[in-house]
Amino acid sequence: MTFFLSFLILLCQFFIGFGLLVRCKFVEDSPKILTAGLSLILGMGISCFGVFVEELLRIPLTLTSVLAVNVILVLIALFPFASTIEALKNFFSSPLKGVKPYGFVTLCLVLFFMFISGWLSYYSPVLSVDAIAGPDLVAKYAVEQGTMASSVFYDLEGNLSNQPFYAPYITIMQIQFRLAGNPFGQVWIPIMALAFIAVLYSKMRSQTHGAIAGLLTVLFIMIPEMFFYTTSLLTDYSNAVFFGCSVMIVMDYVRTKENKYLILASILMGFACFTRIDTIVLAGLGILSTGLYMISKKEEPFPLPKALISMSGMFLVSFLFFFLWNVLYISAYLPVKPTAEEQLYVTLFDFGKVMKNISEINEKLVFDTIYFAYSIPIFFVWVLVNAAIKRSFQPLLLLLWILSIYVGFVIILGLFPAAVIDWTIKRGFFKFFALFYLFIASTQLSKWLDAKITSWEAR
């Protein structure tokens, strides 16, 4: 029964996301692997937000009510049914292209690593101290008492860390899968990771040869610290998934000027801000950089009013998700709340402190391979070689997002007392790597290699 209920929740989440993609006319011109991965990721976010609305309405969180809200969301997403059912038929019935040998190798390696993640997630208890004292603790009480605003905040008043207050997404996912009967709840994490790998591979494959995209995908999976978090109940991997997908889709918006991409990118960035409180800083900087790029790019720049309206709208959606949990819910629903002094302090204007933080970030994370192996050196070398040989820094928008994230981390260290380089920023670096490898796949150097490999294959 546990397997059936878990599968049912995941199936509902897939259909919720698929329905939204159909409504946005995304499915008809997108690769199946991209549609599948993005459907599940979007559906997970929307499903959690639906349960959150249930909590706001003070409806008890039970297995029946959680399944009901998922089914209702499926019906809303699939309506009108005729067009969505037709899209589903095309999605499942159209023949897939034959898998090339390099594609088969990539697939086997991905499934091997994800099998390890799935096995560990199912059989291992929640091990992270932050999760045990935070989202998983809140989820356990919510399953027993039917609300996230449970007696955990009374029973442990005065002994709570900041962990129970800042992770709504993974808390709600834990509630859903614990209600389904999973003893540790966290089986959804490697499934979300697999969906993200599918999205990233598809995006890279659209830019370069399948062998190159496959190699970059395997390098992405093998990042040591990041792979561990496909089995660990913390906000950071989920946050990187929503954030990375949003950046990939907003690039499609800038390229095509089609509003469907703006809508999807805004929703995904909203979920990223719903996942971690500090993401609003990174979102703001990245959206600002995107707006400046839109009006200043050489080819078909956006009119200033259109760029201003679209990027303001994207930021407002992000802020709304941030506001609903961090301001509305914590203030109006929780019996205990962190004080402003505990959440914020400002050292941004302490130049010595800022330079010390930058130095430590570079020393501990950028120039050390212990956590992320050689992903960062590979990225830097590729950027320099591409610039030297091809005289290009394109896609420049991706570089602007990468720079915005880095600057954002410096700001976060100057705003949040709980933010530390060894944990907060180290895990925040997860947001870099999908963008790193997508940039590599999108460079002129990769396209040149693509042409060489294709020419060799044609012999």
Residue ranges and their predicted role:
Residues 261-277, 288:
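Membrane-interface alpha helices of multi-pass inner-membrane proteins
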Residues 246-261:
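Membrane-interface transmembrane helices that cradle and orient dolichyl/undecaprenyl
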Residues 30-37, 182-184, 200-222, 255-257:
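Transmembrane-helix signature of polytopic, membrane-embedded enzymes
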Residues 117, 124, 292-296, 304-386, ...:
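Membrane-lumen/periplasm interface segments of specific transmembrane helices
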Residues 96-101, 205-213, 256-259, 297-309, ...:
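Membrane-interface helix-loop-helix junctions at transmembrane boundaries of multi-pass membrane enzymes
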Residues 193-204, 292, 368-400, 439:
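Hydrophobic, aromatic-rich transmembrane alpha-helices
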Residues 1-95:
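Membrane-embedded, hydrophobic transmembrane alpha-helices
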Residues 72-83, 184-208, 245:
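Transmembrane-helix motifs of polytopic, lipid-linked glycan transferases
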